[in-house]
């Protein structure tokens, strides 16, 4: 087995564990955290470009063990901690290629508009056809009425788009680029992980995973074409605000 393949397998395990492999058993959780820490230490010594991404997914794993993780958006915690380290540790900052806004030309605005419109139509169609059970979401949304909920929706759209783009089209993309190299493979891999991460989101279930995967592919293309995250963040933000408004209508809160 070549060193690159070995590092690719290790990094993939690191990512999947960091995002998905949590248990109600605290012993299992802490043993997993120790294993992830070993992987991070190994990358620090043998493949430094993977050190930063691996470190973030260790932080993500630990954040999921926090008592408030069930509230959602808890990934703000590991992302904020990671950004502080990136800003103050020069070698880590030098390898963080995702911290760029990029350039947005006329063609990108056009494609971004098309992607946004198609995404909104897909969301509305999914909600109308499948009529999902959204009781778990309803229980965490406070109050009712446009005056109360609009600021919450805008804040959610801004924060969630920033966090998810930084993770999937930023940190994860950088790591996958090191171990996979080919743009198409990197894009498909990050979109697949993005899709699986949304299995309990909106849209949800198998169809939700597929829709999120397709959406992730297009956001990845935009990220590559603009060489930065600003355009994907804007597109994602509009989609998230649309999701919030659809949810409010479906939950009869507006």
Located regions from the model:
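Membrane-interface starts of transmembrane alpha-helices
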Residues: 2, 69-77, 148, 152, ...
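Membrane-interface helix/loop boundary segments of multi-pass membrane proteins
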Residues: 103, 162-189, 224-228
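Hydrophobic alpha-helical transmembrane segments
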Residues: 8, 54, 108-113, 150-154, ...
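Juxtamembrane helix-loop-helix connectors linking adjacent transmembrane helices
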Residues: 87-160, 178, 253-254
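Alpha-helical transmembrane segments
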Residues: 2-18, 36, 51-61, 113-120, ...
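Functionally important transmembrane alpha-helices
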Residues: 184-197, 201-254
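Hydrophobic, membrane-facing alpha-helical anchors
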Residues: 3-15, 21-43, 158-167
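Alpha-helical transmembrane segments in multi-pass membrane proteins
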Residues: 19-90
């Amino acid at each position: 087995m070549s060193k690159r393949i070995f590092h690719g397998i290790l990094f993939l395990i690191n990512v999947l564990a960091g995002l998905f492999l949590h248990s109600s058993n605290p012993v299992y959780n802490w043993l997993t955290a120790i294993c992830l820490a070993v992987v991070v230490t190994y990358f620090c010594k043998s493949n430094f470009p993977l050190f930063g991404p691996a470190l973030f997914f260790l932080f993500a794993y630990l954040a999921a063990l926090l008592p408030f993780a069930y509230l959602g958006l808890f990934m703000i915690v590991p992302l904020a901690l990671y950004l502080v380290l990136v800003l103050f540790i020069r070698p880590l900052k030098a390898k963080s290629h995702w911290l760029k806004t990029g350039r947005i030309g006329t063609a990108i605005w056009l494609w971004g508009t098309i992607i946004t419109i198609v995404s909104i139509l897909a969301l509305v169609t999914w909600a109308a056809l499948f009529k999902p059970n959204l009781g778990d979401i309803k229980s965490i949304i406070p109050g009712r009425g446009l005056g109360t909920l609009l600021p919450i929706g805008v804040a959610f759209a801004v924060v969630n788009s920033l966090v998810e783009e930084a993770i999937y089209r930023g940190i994860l993309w950088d790591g996958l680029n090191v171990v996979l190299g080919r743009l198409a493979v990197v894009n498909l891999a990050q979109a697949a992980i993005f899709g699986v991460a949304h299995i309990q989101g909106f849209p949800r279930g198998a169809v939700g995973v597929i829709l999120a995967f397709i959406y992730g592919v297009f956001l990845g293309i935009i990220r590559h074409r603009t060489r930065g995250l600003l355009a994907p963040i804007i597109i994602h933000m509009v989609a998230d605000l649309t999701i919030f408004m659809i949810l409010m209508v479906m939950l009869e809160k507006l």
